[in-house]
Structures are given as C-alpha cells and as structure tokens.
C-alpha cells in the first residue's frame, strides 16, 4: 500500500516560484490583441482599426495620439466594453472584455452634467447608481472637489460654472468609486489654453495620488508628452500603431519643463513623425 505521506506529498500544490510570481505581476492590465473594428455605413464598410496590438501596464499613464478618424475613440470604446470588436480580443488582467465594464471611470470631451443637479449632486449621481454608502460617498466627493480647486462650489449648478469647472466636476464624478482605470476621450479639447494647462496639472496630481491606470485620447502632442509614461502614435485610417514612444521625464512635471530641451525633443520627435506621414504639412 502506498505510504500516506507520499500520497499527501503528491497531491500538494507547490508554492509559486519567484519566476511565476514575477510573470503574474508583469501581466498587462489592459491588452488589445490583433484588434480590428469595421463599421457598416451606407457607403460600405469602413475599417476604423486594423490589427492593433498593445499592452498597458497597471498604473501606467498611456496616451493615444493621432489624426482625426484614426480610431482613437473607437479604441477607448472597445477598452470600455461599449463596442464589440470585429476581430481580435480585449482583455483586462487576462480576462476577456465582452460586456460594458463597471470597474472604470470615463471622461468625455463634453462634461454631460445634469442641469438640475448641483456640482456635488452630479458627482453623487455615480455613487447612487453604484449604491455606494451616502456618507462616505459625499466625503469622497468633497475631497475630490477640493483636489481640483472647487471647494465652495459644491452647491453651484452647471450653468453657474465655467467650462473648465464643469469638466473638473466630470472628472470627480468619474473617480468617485475609486476606479482602477480611468478612460479619457479628449477631455480638454474644448477648453481654452489656460484652462487646459490647469486641468492637466490637476489630472497629473490626481493620477500621482491614486496611480490608477489611465488611457488618454488626445490631439495635443504637448499634452501627451506632459502627462504620459508612453505615447502611442496612430496612423491615419485605418488606424494602426505607428510608433510607441517612452517619455523619460521626471515626475511630477511642471509647466516650466515644457521649455526644456528634453521635453521639446519628444515634441519634435512626434511632430516629425506626423509630418513624415502627411498628417501635418508645412508650407
């Protein structure tokens, strides 16, 4: 008869090795594998994305940059589970995304606030939809408003707020439930330059405090360089990944850094690429 101790030894699972643990920790947070998206239109099929493969690390600030129509927003909607892929797979922590995700915050170019609710009330709308405890949610909302410089504006309605203030409220609403990932689709595109600068600084501070994983869609080269760990440059439609650029600049970043040779070097690298691809044209 086999020895009981031997049987026990055979059925025990070995502890994970350091290599296995390292592999798990290095697993991408968000991954696109051979992703293609084709839209049906009256004029025939339109291929918005073509064979896009990309892995985002947990806690990474990743910007997607490219010309209009290259599929940037489509990529974000696929990441959110709000669109099905025509081909390919989207995964989060190794699990396939095949339905709208509930573990994210989303910020669009338009704040989309309810006019009959105050700034605080608009933020708490997200908490109510998720059935979060009221007292702790309100405390969190006030902390977020303070973090973006809106203390004292809690009871203001959207028509009493500037465009930049409304977008700050939208960002707070997206963060009320402590999402591990924030998806942002050109959130500062409709704002004036000074307001954009302030919101970029606010976003950097929020990201630095929480280190959530951010997927950021933008047309602004300087904005992408300032905020990102990596910048993904897309080709014109059908959108493919043209270049992946690591941004090796110290954090936290300051507005004065935009005048440094290092910052301008990244700017120039991306602009030269866009010129070479015909996205930009000089006289």
Question: Could you tell me what each predicted segment is?
Answer:
Residues 171:
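Hydrophobic anchor residue at the start of the ABC signature
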Residues 88-100:
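Conserved ABC transporter NBD signature motif
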Residues 128, 135-153, 205:
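Conserved ABC ATPase "signature" region
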Residues 156-159, 177:
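Conserved signature/switch motifs of ABC ATPase nucleotide-binding domains
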Residues 117-125:
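Short coil-to-helix segment of the ABC ATPase nucleotide-binding domain corresponding to the Q-loop/switch region
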Residues 65-67:
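The feature captures the beta-strand-to-loop junction immediately N-terminal to the Walker
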